């Protein structure tokens, strides 16, 4: 963790801003705007890009991926520019929580993978890029989105240490644990060999 140097109110404001940005459910907004139905009643019921892909609309899935990752990145960049590095890491955490527990959806949100990657790209782009490449490599080999997410999340702390961003390791560990918790049902299906592959409805 970075040294806490910013004032309490500055940290509170950037934390709240991060949460509000993170809680925007772009998957639901996009699928409703395109007349694709209620995403919570499609496929896995998750509000993220992988489930949007199950509607068969690839542009909608891509837009969801970019916006879900972008909201985390924007929260970090605003906090860093306006306050400092301590606020940036706080905004990364609260934007991630916002995606997982959005107030607009009764605190029932997504699994946070895209937002996780977006915050890492903004906090330290080499770490974010390494995690994105880890996701892509795992997806190419296994064709299972949830497995790719778990491997990318687990590798985050390792990449932080190897690439010289050890001050982010505590944040990375917390985010990884939350991702694993949100994927508990996926983990059971992976172990049982019943987890759907990418592109399957």
From Swiss-Prot:
Pathway: Lipid metabolism; phospholipid metabolism. Keywords: Cell inner membrane, Cell membrane, Lipid biosynthesis, Lipid metabolism, Membrane, Phospholipid biosynthesis, Phospholipid metabolism, Transferase, Transmembrane, Transmembrane helix. It is an enzyme of class 2 (transferase). GO terms for biological process: phospholipid biosynthetic process. It is a multi-pass membrane protein. It is found in: Cell inner membrane. SMART domains: G3P_acyltransf. It catalyses: an acyl phosphate + sn-glycerol 3-phosphate = a 1-acyl-sn-glycero-3-phosphate + phosphate. GO terms for molecular function: acyl-phosphate glycerol-3-phosphate acyltransferase activity. Its EC number is 2.3.1.275. Pfam families: G3P_acyltransf. The chain crosses the membrane at residues 10-30, 59-79, 87-107, 116-136, 161-181. GO terms for cellular component: plasma membrane. Catalyzes the transfer of an acyl group from acyl-phosphate (acyl-PO(4)) to glycerol-3-phosphate (G3P) to form lysophosphatidic acid (LPA). This enzyme utilizes acyl-phosphate as fatty acyl donor, but not acyl-CoA or acyl-ACP. Belongs to the PlsY family. Probably interacts with PlsX. This is Glycerol-3-phosphate acyltransferase. It comes from Cereibacter sphaeroides (strain ATCC 17023 / DSM 158 / JCM 6121 / CCUG 31486 / LMG 2827 / NBRC 12203 / NCIMB 8253 / ATH 2.4.1.) (Rhodobacter sphaeroides). The lineage of its organism: Bacteria, Pseudomonadati, Pseudomonadota, Alphaproteobacteria, Rhodobacterales. The gene is plsY.
């Amino acid at each position: 963790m970075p040294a806490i140097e910013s004032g309490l109110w500055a940290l509170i404001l950037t934390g709240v801003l991060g949460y509000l940005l993170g809680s925007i459910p772009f998957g639901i907004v996009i699928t409703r705007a395109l007349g694709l139905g209620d995403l919570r009643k499609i496929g896995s019921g998750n509000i993220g890009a992988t489930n949007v892909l199950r509607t068969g609309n690839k542009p909608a899935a891509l837009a969801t991926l970019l916006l879900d990752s972008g909201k985390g990145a924007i929260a970090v960049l605003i906090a860093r520019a306006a306050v400092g590095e301590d606020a940036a890491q706080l905004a990364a955490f609260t934007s991630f929580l916002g995606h997982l527990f959005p107030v607009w959806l009764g605190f029932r949100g997504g699994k946070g993978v895209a937002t996780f990657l977006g915050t890492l790209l903004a906090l330290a782009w080499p770490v974010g890029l390494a995690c994105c490449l880890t996701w892509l490599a795992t997806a190419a080999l296994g064709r299972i989105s949830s497995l790719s997410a778990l491997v990318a999340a687990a590798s985050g702390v390792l990449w932080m240490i190897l690439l010289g961003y050890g001050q982010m390791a505590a944040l990375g560990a917390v985010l990884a644990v939350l991702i694993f918790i949100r994927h508990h049902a996926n983990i059971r299906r992976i172990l049982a060999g019943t987890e759907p592959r990418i592109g399957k409805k």
